């Protein structure tokens, strides 16, 4: 199965409880935090709930081991 890189780009301030819980379920805790998840219907459903708070891109082999970006 393919994988997705999901990055939180907006804050949860003002977000509904279901949206906050969806971010936690995906493993996202802060802005610019990225996670790699399998591309399956369950993950796509969680992404649909918080699509305005995250960016989604296909995960390539070079980003598979990173938990986030460091500057």
Curated annotation (Swiss-Prot):
Keywords: Ribonucleoprotein, Ribosomal protein. Pfam families: Ribosomal_L30. SUPFAM superfamilies: Ribosomal protein L30p/L7e. The keyword Ribonucleoprotein applies. It comes from the Bacteria. One of its GO terms (biological process) is translation. Belongs to the universal ribosomal protein uL30 family. This is Large ribosomal subunit protein uL30. It comes from Mycolicibacterium paratuberculosis (strain ATCC BAA-968 / K-10). The gene is rpmD.
